[in-house]
């Protein structure tokens, strides 16, 4: 996967803690999260499993989408994940 603006959701387990982020390099960012190189929420709550991501044409639209998703209630976020990844598989292998 080439560098491209992406909104992503990480979790620690099915229906667990959710983290929504945005990056221009998904591979690198998820790698950093998985190795606890990112201080803060994902390190504290062991949120390392990539369960959803969405590509965008430019960073401004990715940031807008991230903000939108962060305002959603939990049920909507769970439905978004379930729609494209009903098994809650770690999608890391898709992006490496």
Identify the function of each model-found stretch.
Residues 67-81:
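Short arginine-rich
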């Amino acid at each position: 996967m080439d560098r491209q603006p992406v909104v992503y959701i990480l979790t620690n387990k099915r229906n667990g803690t959710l983290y929504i982020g945005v990056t221009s390099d998904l591979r690198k960012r998820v790698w950093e999260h998985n190795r606890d190189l990112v201080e803060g929420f994902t390190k504290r709550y062991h949120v390392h499993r990539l369960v959803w991501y969405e590509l965008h044409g430019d960073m401004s639209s990715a940031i807008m989408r991230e903000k939108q998703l962060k305002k959603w209630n939990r049920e909507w976020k769970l439905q978004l994940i379930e729609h494209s990844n009903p098994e809650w598989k770690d999608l890391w292998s898709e992006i490496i």
